[in-house]
C-alpha cells in the first residue's frame, strides 16, 4: 500500500491553485489515503454477476420544454447583491495572478 506524500498533496494543491499550510497538507494527505483505502476495498468486490447500469433508479420524463420568458427585474436583482458595477455583480478577487 502506497502512502500519499506531502509532495503529492502539494502538487495537487498547486494544480488546484490552493495554498495549504503544513497542518492542512497533513490533513489532506490523511483524508486522501482514507479515500484510496476505501477505493481499494471497493476494487476487491466481485461484480461479475451485477448488471451494468447508469442509474440507481429509472428516471422518466425529467426534462421539460424550454420556455422563453421576459425578465424585467434585472435592476431589482442587482439591488439584492452586496456590491455592483454598472449592470453586473461585483465580487472580491479570489485568485492570485
From Swiss-Prot:
Q: Which Gene3D superfamilies match?
A: Glu-tRNAGln amidotransferase C subunit, N-terminal domain
Tell me one GO biological process term. Answer: regulation of translational fidelity
Record field: catalytic activity:
L-glutamyl-tRNA(Gln) + L-glutamine + ATP + H2O = L-glutaminyl-tRNA(Gln) + L-glutamate + ADP + phosphate + H(+); L-aspartyl-tRNA(Asn) + L-glutamine + ATP + H2O = L-asparaginyl-tRNA(Asn) + L-glutamate + ADP + phosphate + 2 H(+)
Pfam families per UniProt: GatC
Identify the keywords attached in UniProt to this record, alphabetized.
ATP-binding, Ligase, Nucleotide-binding, Protein biosynthesis
Question: For this protein, what is the EC number?
Answer: 6.3.5.-
Kindly indicate whether the keyword Nucleotide-binding belongs to this entry. yes
- Decide whether keyword DNA-binding is in the record: no
Molecular function terms, GO-annotated? asparaginyl-tRNA synthase (glutamine-hydrolyzing) activity; ATP binding; glutaminyl-tRNA synthase (glutamine-hydrolyzing) activity
Q: What class of enzyme is it?
A: ligase
Subunit structure of this entry? Heterotrimer of A, B and C subunits.
* Biological role stated in the UniProt entry: Allows the formation of correctly charged Asn-tRNA(Asn) or Gln-tRNA(Gln) through the transamidation of misacylated Asp-tRNA(Asn) or Glu-tRNA(Gln) in organisms which lack either or both of asparaginyl-tRNA or glutaminyl-tRNA synthetases. The reaction takes place in the presence of glutamine and ATP through an activated phospho-Asp-tRNA(Asn) or phospho-Glu-tRNA(Gln).
HAMAP family on file: GatC
Identify its protein family: Belongs to the GatC family.
Task: Kindly provide the name given to this protein in its UniProt entry.
Answer: Aspartyl/glutamyl-tRNA(Asn/Gln) amidotransferase subunit C
Annotated organism of origin: Prochlorococcus marinus (strain AS9601)
**Taxonomically, what lineage is the organism?**
Bacteria, Bacillati, Cyanobacteriota, Cyanophyceae, Synechococcales
Amino acid at each position: 500500500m502506497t502512502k500519499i506524500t506531502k509532495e503529492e498533496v502539494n502538487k495537487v494543491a498547486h494544480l488546484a491553485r490552493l495554498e495549504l499550510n503544513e497542518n492542512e497538507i497533513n490533513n489532506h494527505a490523511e483524508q486522501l489515503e482514507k479515500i484510496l483505502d476505501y477505493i481499494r476495498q471497493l476494487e476487491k468486490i466481485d461484480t461479475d454477476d451485477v448488471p451494468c447500469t447508469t442509474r440507481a433508479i429509472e428516471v422518466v420524463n425529467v426534462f421539460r420544454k424550454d420556455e422563453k420568458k421576459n425578465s424585467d427585474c434585472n435592476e431589482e436583482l442587482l439591488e439584492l447583491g452586496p456590491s455592483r458595477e454598472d449592470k453586473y455583480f461585483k465580487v472580491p478577487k479570489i485568485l492570485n495572478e
